Amino acid sequence: MAAVTQRISNYLSGVSKQADTKKYPGQVKECINGLPDVTLGMTKRPGFKFISKLKTTGGTDFTGTQLDNAKWFYINRDVTTRYIGCITPYANSANGNIYVWNADTGAACTITYAGTAQNYLSGTSHTNYDVNTVQDVSIITNDSQVITAQPEPTDFVAQSRGTLLLSGKIEQMQGYTFSVTVAGQTTASYTAAANADFDEILNTIETNINALGISGLTVTKHGTSLQLDRVVSSTRTPFTLAASGGDDKERFVVFQDWADNESWLPPNSFHNHVVTIVNSRLYDEDNYYAKFKADNSAAGSGYWIETIGPNKSPGLTKAKMPHRLRNTGTNTFTFEEIPWGDRIVGDDLTNSHPSFLGKTIKKTFFHDDRLGFLSEDNVILSRAKNPYELYAVSARTHTAGDPIDVNCASVRPTKLHAIKPARQGLILFSKNQQFIIYADDGPLTPQSTKIRPVSNMEMSDTVDPIDIGTHFNFISKTPNFVRVFAMQPKGLGESPEILDIGRVVNEWITVDVDTLVASIQNEFIAMSSQSSKDIYFYRTYSDGKETLMESWFKWSLPGTVQSMALDQDDMYCVTKQGNQYTLANANLTQSPEVAIITNALGQKINPCMDLYAQATSVTYDAVNDLSKCYIPYAHLADKKNIVIVAGTTAAGTFNNSGYTVNAEADAGGTYFIVNGQNLSTVASNVYVGYAFDFDLQLPQLYYNLAKEGSQHDYTSNLTIARCKFDVGLSGVMGFKLNVTGRFAATKSYKMFKNNCRDANGVEVYTDYEWSEADLKYIDRNQVKAKINNKLITDFTFQSDTKIRLGNSLLKQTTLSGNGTDTLFAYTFDVQSTDNIKVKIDGIETTDFVFAGGNFISFNTAPPNAANNIFIYNEDDLVIYIDEWYFLEPISDANTYLADDVPLDESRTVTIPIHQRSENFNLRIFTDSPFPVSLNSMMWEGNYSPRFYKRT
């Protein structure tokens, strides 16, 4: 056998669920709480710094399920003003609430609800809400609210008003006859005097109309016109109107609700007089409405402006439209209706409502100085530079700045749920199809906007896709797991490139994922679920030509992840531990600007521990020689408690900086106990928190025939002597080894023979007990069991030294003899009858033979008695400790500075193994609060190709 060595250059390729024979060098079976970095190697993730428990403005902790199923959002005003908030669901006949906390201090913000704005928060799930933040305003959309229009005016009655306008020169009227017919009654003929003026003619006609005595009719003179209104018993009443006069019988312009053109409009009228201008009687599309604005806001001279139809809804119901959460000051917000602009011109044909009327709005977005909306298969954008204006400014002309309302026009049922900007336009996402909205000649306008489909991928409609800079990522859910895809748009005439980036971890990501976020700066995406402690990451690195790193890994946090947000190198998380909600953040750099510990070389670190925070107080108990370090949150009983002393030795002053101890908690869970130390003298430097595991499970090692490591020689004989790891800035390195067939401790039993007895001395065939000396373990998860060398899981602990098997594992039959029959059947199946035993009246007997099938025949008939025959299979039961052995790495001789922080910038550690490669599993495992940085590994061993040459 040849003595060989090979190198694995790095462990940056992350998790792969492929067989070990197909894994590339650098891929691993599992990576928990790691963070791959092309510069630093595979590092232990940063710890999360405790900011605050989430409280109300009154200082009361949120507990239990108060914030469950909430919609979380993040607001970044500037570098120093950041907030994290949530919207709770409608429950117990009460609307939801908005809660916001300062992301840097944890202070609860004051939320003011303007008017009845809180009624908008009627969503029953976090999936009902969308939050779109720009500067100091967050637009909140509830997709359970159906959009309605304001009611149409009821005071308009057609033909209940009329106008008589004298037109032309006075000479065309002097000496000519005038008459008016109102409601079927005609006035007496009137001939204007040769020297009559406009006033005289109108005054006389007004007198003649009044003489008709028509009920409810009022005549008012305005300049050169008469205005007629009819109101009977407070109700506007229609009437007919006609008139003739002048040299051609047409010196009276007569109209009621509409006029043929603008020239018919009188220069004097009453304030808010509305007339329809009918440019063409064949088409309604060119109609518009004019309203008179009197100079004195009453009647007389003034001007005409374009207006809305007198019987048309003025716009949308603001209470049903998206609302806004406005940041009005430090830690203060107001939730209010948005001042949506009303429709001020046109009607439902010439200036229609947005297409989301009668439907719901799924999402809002900003693009090119417009506010956009997604509603079913429609995309609606506001007027340019007027985000709250959803109607055209004029019904007479169309401009490029008018609102845009377009439909996807797909043959598939489509409900748009997300939108992302791309170089070519905007990418629209629905569950089964994706589209692009664009314009050929620049910005989107009502005339130039187009939509066309670009792909037909199936995706989740409850988790929005994310923009990672050069491409988009989205997920697709199956009944049992999640697939992750990358989409890179191409040119307008090309389909996007779509890659299944999650194929290598197929069935690894759980189906309950409800949050997907991205860090463009750090080139990763992250997925989490409100019901899980795990966050799944996918990180890449490209040099501009090719992708040099693709890595899947997972973090496990100290509680279920309710929310996470990424802001440059900071990651904020809200987690739920039991009944408490905590806000924490982690800095993703290994050398943060503000560090807790600095060694003599100036290297800065924050501890790799979760919920680390300054102890709220530190007291020393001189009698018992111990320090009490009080914690600022409810104690987590399932975590390892850590106390660490902060400080710096960079100035040459050596103190307790970096001192670390695994502390016990008091019975009430209010403080950690450090024995033998008086930490009250350095109370401001005492930090408390919880350890978390860095766990890198390495695949089986193979001799690689190809330089790039893609050709595993899995038929050879390879014995690994040792592994040598090159590590960067690291504290304690830990390793675990599991060897096939080697158990830390075992206890063997014959079932139905070595079992326990109850208080009355009766055998309990399901219970098996051992002594602590036989099986000593730390965690019950280490205890395993096998029956006939087959692993079983159907057992429960009755105590620390006793388990109870499930009844289904027992092969037994109880029968009754009658003193005559000798042939009996047992009801279980076995491969061999060698271990079948029989007891009669509790005494084992061999006075029988196997009669074929599942029958036995007694030589002497068993006596007549109930349940006196017991047939069973005496299986072999083994209870054992399946333990990973902790290996102590061997370090080369070196020097270190006494009393300094225990950090090495670079070293090599050796792990002795001396096992065949298929006989062991190796894990890099540590829960130390100090960093870990793994660069590469070289293994040494003996390789034999088994007498065959590889070609």
Residue ranges and their predicted role:
Residues 108, 258, 264, 270, ...:
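Tryptophan-centered short beta-strand motifs
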Residues 7-27, 36-39, 43-47, 58, ...:
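Beta-sheet repeat architectures centered on beta-propellers
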Residues 66-68, 113-132, 340-362, 408-418, ...:
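Short linear interaction motifs
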Residues 68-73, 81-142, 163-247, 262-266, ...:
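Extended, beta-strand-rich, solvent-exposed assembly scaffolds of outer structural proteins
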Residues 150-160, 441-460, 692-712:
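A short, polar beta-strand/turn micro-motif
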Residues 340-368, 375-425, 429-522, 530-532, ...:
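Beta-propeller and closely related beta-pinwheel folds
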Residues 84-88, 140, 372-373, 426-429, ...:
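Conserved beta-strand element within WD40/beta-propeller blades
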Residues 1-106, 265-363, 367-415, 479-496, ...:
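N-terminal beta-propeller domains
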